Swiss-Prot record:
The chain crosses the membrane at residues 173-193. Residues 194-206 are cytoplasmic. GO terms for molecular function: cargo receptor activity. It is a single-pass type I membrane protein. This is Transmembrane emp24 domain-containing protein bai. PANTHER family: TRANSMEMBRANE EMP24 DOMAIN-CONTAINING PROTEIN. Belongs to the EMP24/GP25L family. Residues 21-172 are lumenal. Keywords: Developmental protein, Membrane, Signal, Transmembrane, Transmembrane helix.
Length: 206
């Protein structure tokens, strides 16, 4: 039982890693990282940028509507956190600024983000509740399992919404096609009748 629980915990830990990225930011440019986040989910992150005299980097976190959730200027090393209000694609942007008289060079930026259950401090929970190490691991396993179930439920819901949207779109396209064919048929009939009357008036046909 113990070995099975630890094995499952190890597997879940492998498929639920921290989001870590490192990149080089050219001078006077910006790079944005986007990720879909569920509603009412805590997001935490740590960043560090290489120091270049005379150059500065700002960061800003915002949603698709442009609402600013977190920002800071002239960053070097630090942390940030924000809470998502709705399911949305959130982005974190790093912006390089170099004076016109200075020849800029690329700066190295490293970012580590955590969200949802990843942000919990299980060591603190274990100490506060006086839990044994195994009980703390089982608590982490339970939270990870619940989080995965919620993610799959959300994915299924979004799949159903997209399928409903596709079905509605297909129905509208079919209706529009039938309507267009009826209009063309009506126009063709009107043209035939009009030309028939015209030719009769000109006595070109009987």
């Amino acid at each position: 039982m113990l070995k099975s629980a630890l094995a499952i915990l190890t597997i879940l830990g492998c498929i639920w890693p921290l989001h870590s990225v490192m990149f080089h930011l050219p001078p006077n440019t910006q790079k944005c990282l986007k990720e879909d986040i569920q509603a009412n989910q805590l997001v935490m992150g740590e960043y560090e940028v290489s120091d270049v005299p005379g150059q500065v980097i700002d960061y800003i976190a915002r949603d698709t509507k442009g609402h600013i959730l977190s920002q800071k200027e002239h960053i070097t090393k630090g942390k940030f956190s924000f809470m998502s209000e709705v399911y949305d694609a959130y982005e974190i942007c790093f912006i390089s600024k170099v004076p016109p008289h200075q020849r800029g060079i690329s700066q190295e930026v490293s970012l580590v983000t955590k969200k949802g259950v990843e942000t919990k401090s299980y060591e603190g929970i274990g100490e506060a509740s006086k839990l044994k190490p195994l009980e703390v691991d089982l608590k982490r396993l339970e939270d990870l399992s619940d989080s995965i179930v919620r993610d799959f439920a959300l994915m299924r819901k979004r799949e159903e919404e997209m399928r409903d949207t596709n079905e509605k779109t297909n129905s509208r396209v079919l209706f529009f096609s039938i309507f267009s064919m009826c209009c063309l048929l009506g126009l063709a009939t009107w043209q035939v009748l009009y030309l028939r009357r015209y030719f009769k008036a000109k006595k070109l046909i009987e």
